[in-house]
Amino acid sequence: MLQFSTGESFTVTGTGIVGRNPHAEPGEYFDHIVTIADPGKSVSKTHLEFGQDDGYFWISDRFSGNGTVARDPGGEPRRCEPGRRLRISRGGRVDIGDQFFVVS
């Protein structure tokens, strides 16, 4: 489950994208398209992609303007390199602009 700073939560059952106004590129398919309210526009239109692989949750920054930072419980912040998957532990926090979500 993803719990967002906006108060929303989503159960993850596949892949998805997150952003202010996210859209898939031609030929892409996602199980979830998650729109985040962000009046300050710190979150990009299509900010990041997420999914699960071998029981691990991962994120991939979609070349967002403000980047994506992940923090595993008790760990140091890690910047997500655009276009590369980064594994996130349960309880980890993902910062996207002025918003964030927690993986539970």
Regions found by a protein language model. Give the residues of each.
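Intrinsically disordered, low-complexity acidic Ser/Thr-rich regulatory segments
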Residues: 1-41, 100-103
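Short polybasic amphipathic segments
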Residues: 1-3, 67-70
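ATP/adenylate-binding site constellation spanning eukaryotic-like Ser/Thr protein kinases
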Residues: 15, 64, 85
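C-terminal boundary/linker segments immediately following FHA domains
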Residues: 18, 52, 71-104
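Short hydrophobic/aromatic patches on the structural cores and recognition surfaces of FHA
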Residues: 18, 46-50, 57-60, 66-69, ...
